[in-house]
């Protein structure tokens, strides 16, 4: 379940560090968080959709790796992003 273009643009506008920034860890983590939230809602309705559950676990792992990278490179940006997204860490 990919994100719609309008939703992507909104996330990029909100979390980008520069004007043409689409690949910073903040933007990537925010997009992954939105997809994870959408898939979690899907799985609440479709409990036996194990194929989607496996994809969800892959997205969670990718987000975790990006968060670890951001934490290792710039702890202040990491803490600000965690607070903005409301993630537990």
Swiss-Prot record:
Originating organism: Renibacterium salmoninarum (strain ATCC 33209 / DSM 20767 / JCM 11484 / NBRC 15589 / NCIMB 2235)
Keywords on record: Ribonucleoprotein, Ribosomal protein, RNA-binding, rRNA-binding
GO MF terms, alphabetically ordered: rRNA binding; structural constituent of ribosome
Function comment: One of the primary rRNA binding proteins, it binds directly to 16S rRNA where it helps nucleate assembly of the platform of the 30S subunit by binding and bridging several RNA helices of the 16S rRNA.
One example of a Gene Ontology biological process annotation: translation
GO cellular component assignments: cytosolic small ribosomal subunit
HAMAP family for this protein: Ribosomal_uS15_B
Gene3D superfamilies: 6.10.250.3130, S15/NS1, RNA-binding
Family annotation (InterPro entries): Ribosomal_uS15, Ribosomal_uS15_bac-type, uS15_NS1_RNA-bd_sf
Top-level taxon of origin: Bacteria
Family matches, as PANTHER family: RIBOSOMAL PROTEIN S15, BACTERIAL AND ORGANELLAR, SMALL RIBOSOMAL SUBUNIT PROTEIN US15M
Stated name of the protein: Small ribosomal subunit protein uS15
